Amino acid sequence: MSVLFTILLMAVIGGFIGAMTNYIAIRMLFRPYKAIYLFNKRLPFTPGLIPKRRDELAEHIGKVVVSHLLTEDAIRARLLDENLQKEITDTITKMFHEKMQLETTPNELLHHFGYENAEIRSMAWIEKTMEKEINHFLSTKKTTKMSDLIPTMLESELTTKLPHVTERITSKMALFVASEEGKSQIKQMLQKFFEEHGKMGSMARMFINVDSFSEKIQQEGLKLIDQEDTKNLINQLLTTEWKNFEAKELQELIPTEKQVHLAGQLTSELIQTFPHEKLFNQPIQVILRNYETTIVEKVIPFAVERMLDFVATHSAEIVERMDLAKLVETQIATFSLPEIEKLVVEISGRELKMITYLGGILGGFIGVIQGILAMWI
């Protein structure tokens, strides 16, 4: 009985010593947090291993994360993963549908981002920029001929339209001459002609019936207008004037002293025609609703794909600029020692307990062996 008791006692003592040794060793990884001094001498193993090597640990963890976990290839592969693309697309699509249920005007949206009086400030900026650009254009192009300012397509289109303009002019002239107003104008011109020529005019009026002569002039005028030579002459005059216009420099049409006034006037006219009230106060959803299907089916998937492809292509540069190793090191360095201890215990608490139990088992086993050996010695 005494032999068995001795062996059990040695086993219990050995198990206790083994378990406590491992427990203390584990605790010494974290404790004490600071060095302990006795008679101005630092006690060994103070501070604990992790507090003592904290900076080195943070640096090495950062390097390990970048070298073996968040590598460029791993990041690129993840960014090009179709599942990730689908998840991001679905998330953005869901957010888009949620926003489409609201009624948000551009004014409200800009106000949300801290941009006050958006409509007034935007229109003031547009007006200022527009006037500046018009002034700049007029100043830099003042010696440029109009033929160089007018787009080739527009010039060609206007040139081909000249015969149509001629037809329209002769048509309007014929309509006017044939009208009662035209006849009245001819009669007034004849009467004025006679009055301006004194006695000769009075004598001519004795032999000429103004009404019948007016009708005759009216008929001859219509014949003259309808003649091909007349149309050719008008067309030639228009062509000549157009060529003269093209040959002029911009400053001949708009003198330098009038440029500022013209730019301001033109800007004001353009601003008045700009529907800014409707643009800034109409819900964005109303504008987008006509394109909702296209945005969901094409725009969002395309934008997500292009964005991920861009990030993947430049992942090496992005990772380098982000300096992930330094980022991880900095984040770990911000943790307090109790937080690091808690984090490690939460992650590997079970394993640490098993190490303690293993120390107890080994200590107990060694105690049994010691008890047996003690009986033999």
Swiss-Prot record:
Q: Name where it mostly resides.
A: membrane
User: Looking at the keywords, is Transmembrane present?
Assistant: yes
Per UniProt, what is one Pfam family of this protein? DUF445
Note the superkingdom of the native organism: Bacteria
Bilayer-crossing residues are: 1-21, 357-377
Query: Where does the UniProt annotation locate this protein?
Result: Cell membrane
Matches recorded under InterPro entries:
DUF445, UCP032178
Keywords assigned by UniProt? Cell membrane, Membrane, Transmembrane, Transmembrane helix
Membrane topology per record:
Multi-pass membrane protein
Cellular component, GO annotation: plasma membrane
Q: Report whether Iron-sulfur shows up as a keyword of the record.
A: no
Entry similarity comment: Belongs to the UPF0754 family.
* Name of the featured protein: UPF0754 membrane protein LMHCC_0318
Q: Which organism is it from?
A: Listeria monocytogenes serotype 4a (strain HCC23)
